[in-house]
Amino acid sequence: MLNEVGKINIKGINHLLFSVSNLEKSIEFYEKVFHAQLLVKGQKTAYFDLNGLWLALNLEADIPRNEIHKSYTHMAFTIDPKDFDAIHHRLKNLNVNILNGRPRDKQDQKSIYFTDPDGHKFEFHTGTLQDRLSYYKKDKPHMKFYI
């Protein structure tokens, strides 16, 4: 439904779906790394509850996975700064593929970048959008702000 000014009324993210090459391996990853609760599993599909977010996996074993690694495209989740070190340690203990983060200013807060077994990139980040905007407004005069 369109709202009064003709814009689509987006109410939020409905679900996240990831194409996976090995459903069992991916289920184990999402359960262990994200503590996602498995809701249903079929031959080619699994659905999870991730703190109220619907997460879906679809088995697509024949899809080439090499291109996904070249992009900065990722999904970022907010974590509490006090949990950063413990989460980083936990990911290491689970043998998760932790990526080198991009160079950043300390005002940009802390991040852990990592991939699932198929190369989908994720980030656990301690900052907020407001943190980022405040930093950019102060230190990046070349940027144009619309808010």
Curated annotation (Swiss-Prot):
Domain VOC, chain residue ranges per copy: 12-127
Domain of life: Bacteria
A GO molecular-function descriptor: magnesium ion binding
One example of a Gene Ontology biological process annotation: response to antibiotic
Key words, A-Z: Antibiotic resistance, Cytoplasm, Magnesium, Metal-binding, Transferase
Catalytic site positions: E123 (proton donor/acceptor)
Keyword Transcription: no
Entry's Gene Ontology cellular component terms: cytoplasm
CDD domains assigned: FosB
Binding site for Mg(2+): H15, H74, E123
InterPro entries: Fosfomycin_Res_Enzymes (IPR051332), Glyas_Bleomycin-R_OHBP_Dase (IPR029068), Glyas_Fos-R_dOase_dom (IPR004360), Metallothiol_Trafse_FosB (IPR022858), VOC (IPR037523)
EC number: 2.5.1.-
Transmembrane regions listed in the UniProt entry: none
Signal peptide stretch: none
Subcellular location: Cytoplasm
Needed co-factor(s): Mg(2+)
PROSITE patterns cross-referenced by the UniProt entry: VOC
Gene3D superfamilies: 2,3-Dihydroxybiphenyl 1,2-Dioxygenase, domain 1
Subunit architecture: Homodimer.
Function (record text): Metallothiol transferase which confers resistance to fosfomycin by catalyzing the addition of a thiol cofactor to fosfomycin. L-cysteine is probably the physiological thiol donor.
Family statement drawn from the similarity comment of this UniProt entry: Belongs to the fosfomycin resistance protein family. FosB subfamily.
Listed name of the protein: Metallothiol transferase FosB
